[in-house]
UniProtKB/Swiss-Prot annotation:
Region of interest: Helicase lobe 1: 200-375
Residue segments, region WH: 115-177
Species this chain originates from: Klebsiella pneumoniae subsp. pneumoniae (strain ATCC 700721 / MGH 78578)
Annotated region (CRR), positions in chain: 431-485
Protein name in UniProt: Replication restart protein PriA
Length: 731
């Protein structure tokens, strides 16, 4: 009898064997319902064979086959199989992650009826001026008069569901549902919107990509902020859609704005589907199916849209390719950018990686000849670059982390009826210990790196060599007792600014204040209306948002990036600074950027200010080569957590011994730790980690694979929660 090897969404790196009943035929990639323990579960057939490691009479039969054909396309299936192996993650978890929720639940892989809004007869004739007191209702009814609006697309528009419900209450709009009809956009395809005239650099980029349209090619589109990268994407898509092929456009979580989506919808007379967190399960399945059967011409989405099946994919675009949100930080820790390149190679199509501040790994791949670079160096509209200033904080009396000079400049810009942005980049920065009076930083005597401050354990610790020392009472350089951790949080800053600027509306935009659905849009709308004059934010604010009245931008905790134990923090700061500089001074207003630091002479600041991001990247790549850090080497991070701060370090020490005893290990394998994680305690659990480094990615993969096969033999393995992160981007 045939045996189905079934992947289930459980944290075990294996498949489970079931007998296929007489007459039941399934293929790899089809869903089945199987008995598992005392219940039935949905599984995915990974393979079918005639044998099992267990006696056949001990196997249970498959209860039901749910699909005649695989739910995955051939290329996505190959991608997922490879990714499960590369990231050492359970195959069942990987396969289920790539499916819409309704398919995970066993629902049919077919379209369900969708709801849409339409204008009633009264709504078609009523005077729109009667709604002028409610701008959103007026906008909504005007849009409905142009045609029906699918309910799942309301979040992409300038009005909201509440406005439509209000119109419904007045008898001007109504809801109905219908099964989406299979439509072919290709016969009526045209470019609907206005084309902008491409400059020479843009035209060269479009031509180069078009010349390689029939094979794999990876292009870095490096363009300064405001240089017109989106127009290049649109022109490339124009060529792809004209051939009847489809396009996948990936954007960071925060970049999926109504304005971005509108640009694509207005340009093409072809269906654009958007995959984002605001969709309900049936809407997400509908968009997924439209891509699979070829109905969707363009899919725009965040990280997980990478796994969408397409009937005939012609190009992949990854906007802001350096953005850290492309790396999944929970569960299966994959990097969508890296997997997208793998997929493009498998599909034999071009991929475009766009950024004003390319990741060092991407620039390294250009140097290695794996990618080709296209550069856009001219800013659209000849906007003037912002004026840049560095404020030395040493010995200055600070209020809420702000120097007197910065507070004075803020007052001047606010009095001119402009807006001010204050940036904090706390995410991923490890705190260092700094003397406020002379600028001394606690430095490890054995390494060329800075101690990380661990307040809870009352000590300084080096995350490179693991040496530690007590927190000093006074500065060894000047004797001052004014020793402070570098950095301040957005919440404390908001509270401290209120008494300094009592009449000025303040808006804080970070993950805490925008976690509720629609909250980010509400904050941004308030900013555009002029309702908030001071904006406090993290990197979320730096990405692509156009604030015409912002003329002053300040980065407050620069030292946190310059002296972090995380070797990537300088790169992240350089990217943030470059993006932020583009936020100040648009719409004909002169912008100003102010950096606050205790170390104005720092080489990184000097390079960034006077030579720009490209020069910084050259310098940073050279430094990483000297220190043998990625991209010159490969990393795997293994983190363990416990409740008592004892089992996790013990487990990791046992694991370290196992790794170093591996017959595959050689003198080039470098292991750091166990050391406390940069955030040593979260949710009541203590976190420890070890970092593995090797110049050969393939060799490191073999070492890790061999060790993981033995990990459950370790005495502490079942007493801790542990995770493995291949190519980690955060320490």
């Amino acid at each position: 009898m045939s045996v189905a090897h079934v992947a289930l969404p459980v944290p075990l790196p294996r498949t489970f064997d079931y007998l296929l009943p007489e007459g039941m035929a399934v293929k790899a990639g089809c869903r089945v319902r199987v008995p598992f323990g005392k219940q039935e579960r949905i599984g995915i057939v990974a393979a079918v064979s005639e044998r099992s490691e267990l006696p056949l009479d001990e196997l249970k039969p498959v209860a039901e086959a749910l699909d005649d054909e695989p739910v995955f396309s051939t290329t996505v299936w190959r991608l997922l199989m490879w990714a499960a192996e590369y990231y050492h993650h359970p195959i069942g978890d990987v396969l289920f992650h790539a499916l819409p929720v309704m398919l995970r639940q066993g629902k049919p892989a077919s379209a369900t009826p969708l709801w849409y809004w339409f204008a009633t007869e009264q709504g078609q004739v009523v005077d729109l001026n009667g709604l002028k007191r409610s701008r959103k209702q007026q906008q909504a009814l005007a849009a409905l008069r142009q045609g029906k609006i699918w309910r799942h697309q309301v979040g992409e528009l300038e009005f909201n569901e509440a406005a439509l419900q209000a119109l419904r209450g007045k008898g001007l709009a109504e809801l109905a549902c219908e099964a989406p009809a299979l439509t072919d956009w290709r016969s009526a395809y045209s470019v609907a919107g206005e084309r902008l005239r491409l400059n020479t650099e843009q035209a060269t980029a479009v031509g180069a990509i078009h010349s390689a349209a029939d094979r794999f090619s990876a292009w870095l589109l490096a363009g300064i902020t405001g240089s017109g990268k989106t127009e290049v994407y649109l022109s490339v898509l124009e060529n792809v859609l004209a051939q009847g092929r489809q396009a996948l456009v990936m954007v960071p979580e925060i970049g999926l704005t109504p304005q971005t989506i509108a640009r694509f919808r207005q340009r093409f007379n072809a269906p654009v589907e958007v995959l984002h967190s605001g969709l309900n399960d049936s809407e997400r399945l509908s968009a997924w199916l439209k891509a699979k059967n070829g109905e969707a011409a363009i899919v725009i989405g965040t990280r997980s849209s990478l796994f969408t099946p397409f009937k005939d994919l012609g190009v992949i675009v990854i906007d802001e390719e350096h953005d850290s949100s492309y790396k999944q930080q929970e569960g299966w820790r994959y990097h969508a950018r890296d997997l997208a390149v793998w997929r493009a190679h498998s599909e034999q199509i071009p991929i475009i990686l766009g950024s004003a501040t390319p990741a060092l790994e991407t620039l390294h791949n250009v140097r290695q000849g794996k990618y080709r670079q296209l550069t856009l160096s001219k800013r659209a509209g000849n906007a003037r670059p912002a004026q840049q200033h560095v404020l030395d904080l040493k010995g200055q009396p600070l209020q809420a982390g702000l120097s007197p000079a910065l507070i004075s400049r803020m007052r001047q810009h606010l009095q001119a009826d402009n807006q001010v942005i204050l940036f904090l980049n706390r995410r991923g920065f490890a705190p260092a210990l700094l003397c406020h009076d002379c600028g001394w930083i606690a430095e490890c005597p054995r390494c060329d790196s800075y101690y990380t401050l661990h307040q809870a354990q009352h000590h300084l610790r080096c995350h490179h060599c693991d040496s530690q020392r007590p927190i000093p009472r006074q500065c060894p350089s000047c004797g001052s007792t004014h020793l402070v951790p570098v950095g301040i949080g957005t919440e404390q800053l908001e509270q401290a600014l209120a008494p300094l600027f009592p009449e000025v509306p303040i808006s804080r935009i970070d993950r805490d204040t925008t976690s509720r659905k629609g909250a980010l849009e509400e904050h941004l709308a308030a900013v555009h209306r002029g309702g908030a004059r001071i904006l406090i934010g993290t990197q979320m604010l730096a990405k692509g948002h156009h604030f015409p009245d912002v003329t002053l931008v300040s980065l407050l905790d620069v030292d946190g990036a310059l002296f972090s134990a995380d070797f990537r923090s300088a790169e992240r700061f350089a990217q943030l600074y470059t993006q932020v500089s583009g936020r100040a001074g648009r719409a004909g207003k002169q912008g100003e950027v102010i950096l606050q630091t205790h170390h104005p002479e720092h080489p990184l600041l000097q390079t960034l200010l006077y030579k720009g991001y490209d020069a910084f990247a050259e310098q940073a790549l050279a430094e990483r080569q000297t220190m043998q850090l990625p991209p010159w080497t490969s990393h795997v991070l293994i983190r363990a957590e416990d409740h008592n701060n004892q089992q996790a370090p013990l487990f990791l020490q046992q694991l370290r011994n196992l790794l170093q005893a591996s017959p595959l290990a050689d003198e080039k394998l470098w292991v750091l730790g166990p050391v406390p994680a940069l955030a040593p305690k979260r949710g009541g659990r203590w976190r420890w980690q070890i970092l593995l480094q090797h110049p050969s990615r393939v060799r490191l993969q073999h070492i890790v694979s061999g060790t993981l096969a033995l990990i459950n033999t370790l005495p502490e393995a079942r007493k801790v929660k542990w995770v493995l992160d291949v190519d980690p981007i955060e320490g």
